[in-house]
Amino acid sequence: MMLPADFFVPVSKMMLLALLLSIIICCGGAQRSEPMFTAVTDTVLPQDYDSNPTQLNYGVAITDVDNDGDFEVVVAGYNGPNLVLKYIKEKGHLVNIAVDERSSPYYALRDRQGNAIGVAACDIDGDGREEIYFLNTNNAFSGIATYSDKLFTFRNGRWEDLFSDEVNLRRGVANRFSGRSVACIDRKGSGRYSFYIANYANGNVGPHALIELDETASNLSRGIIVLSNVAAELGLNKYTGGRGIAVGPIVNSAASDIFCDNENGPNFLFQNKGDGTFVDIASSTGVDDVYQHGRGVALADFNRDGKVDIVYGNWNGPHRLFLQMNTNGKVRFRDIATQKFSMPSPIRTVIAADFDNDQELEVFFNNIAYRGPSANRMFRVGRREHADPFMEELNPGDASEPDGRGTGGAVTDFDGDGMLDLILSHGESMAQPLSVFKGKQGLKNNWLRVIPRTKFGAFARGAKVVLYTKKSGAHLRIIDGGSGYLCEMEPVAHFGLGKDEASSLEVTWPDGKIFTRSVAEGEINSVLDIAYPHEDDTVTKPTDIECGQGFSVNENGRCTDTDECIQFPFVCPREKPVCINTYGGYKCRPNRRCSRGFEPNEDGTACVAQVAYFGSYPSSASRSQALFLHCTASLLGLGFYFQIYTL
């Protein structure tokens, strides 16, 4: 029997609305409408010959250049001077203090002759003040450059280049190869850092380098700082198209590891063996990504399981978000990037931070307008209970810069309002000034900023900070030692709290030293400076610490995961008797048996292939396929409706 056409008319609008809404929800095609950033360049850093010239800029690093306790923004100038931007609170402006005056203590930092591309800062000699490394690439894409790198230290009341010292000239230690990124690592946990340089080799010319203090040959009391390149003896002198670097306790609990994403070759994941030597485990852990060309990279714990994950961009290739897993004692990484997240782009910098202080991390992709506009993109990566994190594309607002020739970027809170500020540099194919952006979302959310120090009082780059909260479990940050690609973020563990409260924090230094302390209610929305602990400081009374939900204090006064599965009465219901302890929680599932190579799914209703067993890691394909089928069903439903409606 054919129904009359007017039968469908009363419900047509509602059905159409429902079907369209279903398609929008399942396909997730739109960005959030609220812009995340607003440009403040015109007021904070107006275009200016001295402080914001229109020139080719590259890397951006955050450090305390003038030793006054506030951060400065250091910018690598390629066809112009390097810049050191200081925030003047009274004026609300960023001003370049590396002025063109030879009497200035910062004059040498300008290094007008160098074509600087990468920049990083850390304390190489243990004087409590960070040195600044500029990686120059004069007249060379790869291989040998015509001008060496610069390594500046503050000595004799001014910044001076250590590579120009006679003793270091005789040693020929200055890097003269064309490189890209530079990062800092305290490989032995001594509090003194080495600079790791990702050079871009031309055949067997231009290996990676690791430059550090030669303690036996130096006389620090007389200002004699002797340097050595120890990459060869550590097996780090690799020949490849070096691009991005990230440093921190990636697979170790404390000692700093090194991740390098490369071009025209596999990535490296150098695991620190605990004595300052390394072994490459990229292939065995699944992050070698042989056929892609890496750029920006950052470290974070996206699913809040206490393990460090790796996110990076590939040049016009699929971007990656590798979650760290531990299966039968073996470390593996699994790419969970969704189709939208992994969408290829001419990527440069990648930044992971909580820009709106809502407790969820955002990932910012800074692109370069390459053969046409290429807007920057941004995703919220949020934790889901017993599932992979969700990825929600956000609207970057003014920071989208579709015509920006993005080459670098960094985050810091230069005005002290608890919201991270974003500084982007541009260049390469077109001279453009710097851009500065402030966050617009989450202005009323709580926050906490933690700055660990080395035993010498410098910033403890590579340290791990875990913040325990009353309602949302543990949040992990790594103090940045150089990442993003050519850049280095602020040496701060920045935590957005939303409406939650912090209960305690734990800092782990690269030497394995651990310090735990409670966080008072009055310390929320403030900056905590954490000194390197003396022996007496590491002893914490358990009664002083509150860990929050899912964690409890052990006999050493540290917060550890509570194993709910051994508690009485039993936490799981009878229909799901299998209890699995997770970091900060637990999950229950039915007692389902599976064949070898398979395991129960999350609900225990079916057997699915074990990712680690088959030695592969699912990309977005499986999720994209499910999403595609769901969307297709909705579209078919819509088509069916229109077909009936027209009958």
Curated annotation (Swiss-Prot):
SUPFAM superfamilies: EGF/Laminin, Integrin alpha N-terminal domain. Residues 561-607 form the EGF-like domain. The keyword NAD does not apply. GO terms for molecular function: calcium ion binding. It comes from the Eukaryota. Residues 1-30 form the signal peptide. InterPro entries: Crtac1, EGF-like_Ca-bd_dom, EGF_Ca-bd_CS, FG-GAP, Integrin_alpha_N, NOTCH1_EGF-like, UnbV_ASPIC. Its main location: secreted. It is found in: Secreted, Extracellular space, Extracellular matrix. GO terms for cellular component: extracellular region. FG-GAP repeats lie at residues 48-90, 107-149, 285-335, 397-439. This is Cartilage acidic protein 1. It comes from Xenopus tropicalis (Western clawed frog).
